[in-house]
């Protein structure tokens, strides 16, 4: 019982340090992604801090603008919930949280990711931007709806698409997440890390940097799962070629269109932290190097390796069109099949 207060203090301290470093680092990732993407397309690209850090700072200083929504308070609160969800998603993969009520497990990760997906459905159902409100006079142009029929808002289509993506688009990522846990024959993150990096679990020196001896990434099921995880990573970030939720050609920005000024800054924080959290989770589960605030070398290694997925994302986005559901459904089914194959192989390892 004497160790409980010390554990709680350590949990609070590690959470504050990890959250602060994670949020600040996440504001750099979009700039690196955009810079790599620009270089691939033979452009100079923006300064590294502009898409993340300076954009958040700029929108944070703008005058508050109330969004047009069916329930404005609920719509505003969704972005706050989003920040809390993605920060907890990241914290649950840090070592101190592995012993808290089983949250450092596949269930904690999958549950929070699913909550994050639900937010986009709610955003699309609530937002009613002036760009898609009903006209003050009847629209009698050829092909328009008849007078008296209720017009739909553009964002509602974004909500419907988010629901479809939540049902099948994100399935490959969850199957890929299962593979490291299946190989460790446990649902806990600690067991997955111990299987790959036993030296880290046994180490008590805060300056040590035990490297993994058998990373999941270097096995056949691990390679297959990593490929599936990366595509699922792109899907959850709503980036090309899976950015149909916010396709400029018909939905403009989708359900987040009405987020302006400070709300837009919060939305950027939410998205950027999600990008970093998913990258850090990949490094923890597939390589065996967790983000440990009390082991600086391990923390720096995790941060450095977390650049892999954003750089790969930049290369993909640089050449990708926007897919429709006619292409997304077969892609998701095919990737899910690869994920199932990796899972079956991992159970026999």
Where are these regions (language model features)?
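Juxtamembrane inter-helical linkers in multi-pass membrane proteins
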Residues: 35-60, 132-158, 239-263
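Transmembrane alpha-helix boundary signature
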Residues: 87-101, 121-133
